[in-house]
From Swiss-Prot:
The keyword Ribosomal protein applies. This is Large ribosomal subunit protein uL6. InterPro entries: Ribosomal_uL6-like (IPR000702), Ribosomal_uL6-like_a/b-dom_sf (IPR036789), Ribosomal_uL6_a/b-dom (IPR020040), Ribosomal_uL6_bac-type (IPR019906), Ribosomal_uL6_CS (IPR002358). GO terms for molecular function: rRNA binding; structural constituent of ribosome. It comes from Pelobacter propionicus (strain DSM 2379 / NBRC 103807 / OttBd1). The gene is rplF. This protein binds to the 23S rRNA, and is important in its secondary structure. It is located near the subunit interface in the base of the L7/L12 stalk, and near the tRNA binding site of the peptidyltransferase center.
Length: 179
């Protein structure tokens, strides 16, 4: 039995679940998410919890057991609490601002980088150097934050660039010069 897969998923009262034709739909106060569940895994939905069970003991069923439980748990948590990812911008003249449905980044290039904010995600900018990506779909929030970071990843010598708030940058020493 999978250590993660055997844990039940608690459901709050304001979450509505629908499971038919191997598609799970979860609706809550923040939004609605749907996901196809693998056929080797089955869901048992009660009033207060979801239990993920596998249909057989094959290798795919065992590996999908814990994965499916985590994905369903992320769906339930997303529509109730939501997810967020924080980014920091370091560098002289590096800044960000939200204009309508676009995030405009000044990252030391000759032109500003314009990023269109995807549907289902909100972006807040605090003090021009802190960007917070929020949403109810964990996968979309992480993907959006990774795209913003990829415009100027932090470099190891001065640490300039866009980094996650909880990320540590391994710093390198510069050239020592000729002796």
């Amino acid at each position: 039995m999978s250590r993660i897969g055997k844990l039940p998923i608690d459901i709050s009262k304001d979450v509505k679940l629908a499971f038919s034709d191997s598609i799970l739909s979860v609706q809550g106060p923040l939004g609605k998410l749907s996901r196809r569940i693998m056929p080797c895994v089955n869901l048992e939905i009660t009033d207060s919890c979801i239990i993920v069970m596998r249909n057989d003991e094959s290798g795919t069923a065992r590996s999908a057991h814990g994965l499916t439980r985590t994905l369903v748990s992320n769906m339930v948590n997303g529509v109730t609490k939501g997810f967020q990812k924080s980014l920091e911008i370091n560098g002289v003249g590096y800044r960000a601002e939200v204009k309508g449905s676009e995030l405009v980044l000044s990252l030391g290039y000759s032109h500003p980088v314009v990023f269109t904010i995807p549907a289902g995600v909100t972006i807040e900018v605090d003090k021009l150097t802190k960007v917070v990506v929020k949403g109810f779909d964990k996968e979309l929030v992480g993907e959006t934050a990774a795209k913003i970071r990829s415009f100027r990843p932090p470099e190891p010598y001065k640490g300039k660039g866009v980094k996650y708030a909880d990320e540590t940058i391994l710093r390198k020493a510069g050239k020592t010069g000729k002796k």
